[in-house]
């Protein structure tokens, strides 16, 4: 089934991968190589995923994302808001070519309210090709091309105002 829903992630001004020119206070967050879910969990008591949309879309319905992924007749889209202690911290959008969803990766269709990072970083076969940073107005964003068992998926994350990325003095979880 195809869908025409609008993305929760609006236009992002992407920076060069080679020279992201990031302020030091946000570089550590945006260039995080590990799980953002795990990183966020060090700054809150509870992470909840608010699933906004998931489903297949046709190739022509993708925006600039189609240039970053292999051509596929359909792509699985998953859009979420990651909330920490009941505050929205991150918008996430995952784009997965249909061929990536074969074998064990078929489980990506059934994550529901499970954070994507919990699934991805439990795999021994996960590799990140790159991280690209950008801005959506005053908000910082990043996108990563990941390879799960040598099969690609694109993850875009927009850090919302309550995110610890913007709270430079908040370093650890509150007691």
Curated annotation (Swiss-Prot):
Keywords annotated in UniProt: Cytoplasm, Lyase, Pyruvate, Ubiquinone biosynthesis
Subcellular localization, as worded in the UniProt entry: Cytoplasm
Tagged with keyword Lyase? yes
Purpose:
Removes the pyruvyl group from chorismate, with concomitant aromatization of the ring, to provide 4-hydroxybenzoate (4HB) for the ubiquinone pathway.
Question: Sorted alphabetically, which HAMAP family does this protein's record hold?
Answer: UbiC
How does this polypeptide assemble, per the annotation? Monomer.
Protein name, as recorded: Chorismate pyruvate-lyase
The scientific name of the source species is Hamiltonella defensa subsp. Acyrthosiphon pisum (strain 5AT)
């Amino acid at each position: 089934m195809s869908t025409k829903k609008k993305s929760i992630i609006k236009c992002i001004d992407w920076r060069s991968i080679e020279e992201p020119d990031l302020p030091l206070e946000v570089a550590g967050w945006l260039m995080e190589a590990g799980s953002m879910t795990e990183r966020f969990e060090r700054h809150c008591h509870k992470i909840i995923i608010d699933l906004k949309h998931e489903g297949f879309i046709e190739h022509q319905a993708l925006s600039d994302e189609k240039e970053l992924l292999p051509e596929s007749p359909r792509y699985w889209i998953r859009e979420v808001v990651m909330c920490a202690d009941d505050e929205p911290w991150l918008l996430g959008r995952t784009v997965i070519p249909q061929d990536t969803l074969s074998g064990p990766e078929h489980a990506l269709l059934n994550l529901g309210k499970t954070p994507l990072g919990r699934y991805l970083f439990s795999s021994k076969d996960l590799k990140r090709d790159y991280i690209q940073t950008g801005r959506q107005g005053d908000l910082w964003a990043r996108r990563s091309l990941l390879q799960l068992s040598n099969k690609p998926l694109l993850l875009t994350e927009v850090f919302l105002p309550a995110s610890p990325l913007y709270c430079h003095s908040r370093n650890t979880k509150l007691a």
